Regions:
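Short, aromatic- and glycine-rich surface loops/edge beta-strands on solvent-exposed regions
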Residues: 349-357
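Phosphate-group recognition and catalysis centered on beta-loop-alpha active-site segments
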Residues: 18-295, 350
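Sec-dependent N-terminal signal peptides
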Residues: 4-13
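Edge beta-strands of extracellular beta-sandwich domains
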Residues: 361-369
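Short, surface-exposed beta-strand/strand-loop-strand elements in extracellular ectodomains
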Residues: 318-324
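Exposed aromatic-hydrophobic patches
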Residues: 338-344
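Solvent-exposed serine/threonine-rich low-complexity stretches and specific carbohydrate-binding patches
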Residues: 326-334
Length: 371
């Protein structure tokens, strides 16, 4: 309920105070997809989906992880049925239904009728129960409505906006694109939040972006994959005028800098933050740690579906390793606090933290959540 109220507050207000700089709204990129390492017949270790991206199950999993919403990508089949697919071709995320074999030639959803797509192909997953047909936009929006999840539509199809508006209303979805004329079509039918990707404009001066946002009108903001664009000054200039700022799938550790700079929405493949009012199943607390006192914690309990988060107040440089795979090297010249974390499945979490010779960790709070 608290997450839903926060979501409504953000989407129904352009006020900068809707969120604090270190607590952005969290949106799961292509849903709460998951993957695990598997060994191929040739002995190679590769990552395989468990919960496929852009699937109905990815909406439910995003809700389970505690995200406020999901982002999805919309395309037409040959007979103009709207389905979810990110890549230009289906080859990375889809297999043949008959024998679960990989596609040998490039194939687009637009090459197939909807019936052909549903009959002959399934989403790739290491879990046979997840090998289901590519979902329609309507199916995914219905799942968003079921769980009270915001749907962020990365789409160039005005018909997709009309469907989202009809099913979810102004506060239930977001239009997300880099083309002004497409976003104008969304504004004609809805007072939803609109996020403009300014990446295609030649001059990315913030005031030129503001001119584009003013033409769109209503609730709007920007979304960018370019971390060099979303500086503290850029974010502050937009947010002081009531616009939202979304960092889009920044890689480790750059999402932390985006939060320092003041983004209001974090579109992410992995990130999780410490949660208010949610009890952790395992925790670690440390104070006043110096260079000679590194933290090395391996929890013994395996968690099926969880998150490891860290809140750290420090000065100097710290090196943080989450679950042996996500490394953060963070520096502060004056004392301050950063919050970071990652979602994971089917593992016992671990944490390593070291501080530079001239630094000190004032407080370290690590929490493991189980969903």
């Amino acid at each position: 309920m608290k997450r839903l109220l926060t979501l409504v507050a953000v989407l129904t207000s352009l006020c900068v105070s809707a969120q604090t700089a270190d607590s952005p709204l969290m949106i799961a990129h292509r849903g709460g997809w998951t993957e695990r390492s598997v060994t191929t017949p040739e002995g190679t270790i590769v990552k395989e989906f468990v919960v496929p991206e852009n699937s109905v199950a990815a909406v439910a999993m995003a809700h389970r992880f505690g995200y406020a919403g999901i982002e999805c990508d919309v395309k037409y089949t040959a007979d103009s049925v709207m389905v979810l697919m990110h890549d230009r071709t289906m080859n990375r995320t889809v297999r043949r239904a008959a024998d679960y074999s990989r596609l040998s030639e490039p194939l687009k959803v637009s090459d197939l009728t909807f019936d052909e797509l549903r009959r002959d192909y399934v989403l790739a997953s290491d879990d046979p129960s997840m090998r289901v047909p590519v979902p329609t936009l309507k199916e995914v929006l219905a799942e968003c409505k079921k769980y009270g999840m915001i749907a962020v539509l990365h789409s160039t199809l005005p018909e997709s906006f009309a469907m989202a508006q009809q099913m979810l209303g102004d506060d239930g979805w977001v239009a997300f694109n880099s083309y002004d004329d497409i976003l104008v079509e969304a504004r004609k039918i809805s007072n939803c939040l609109i996020l403009l990707d300014p990446g295609k404009q030649k001059n990315q001066n913030v005031y030129n972006t503001i001119e584009r946002l003013e033409r769109l009108g209503g609730r709007c903001g920007v979304s960018s994959m370019k971390r060099t664009l979303l500086t503290a000054e850029y974010c502050q200039t937009l947010r002081e005028r009531g616009y939202q700022v979304q960092s889009s799938i920044f890689k480790t550790p750059h999402e932390v800098q985006a939060m320092r700079n003041g983004v209001s929405i974090l579109l992410t493949d992995f990130a999780k933050l410490p949660e208010e009012g949610v009890s952790s199943v395992m925790k670690l607390r440390k104070r006043n740690r110096r260079e000679s006192q590194p933290v090395n914690k391996q929890w013994n309990r395996e968690v099926e579906c969880g998150a490891l988060t860290v809140e750290i107040e420090f000065v100097g440089t710290v090196d943080i390793l989450l679950n042996g795979e996500r490394r953060y090297s963070l520096t502060r010249t004056t004392r301050g606090t950063d919050r970071l974390g990652m979602r994971f499945i089917e593992s016992a979490p671990s944490l390593q933290v070291a501080v530079s010779e001239d630094g000190i960790i004032r407080t370290l709070k690590a929490d493991v959540y189980q969903y």
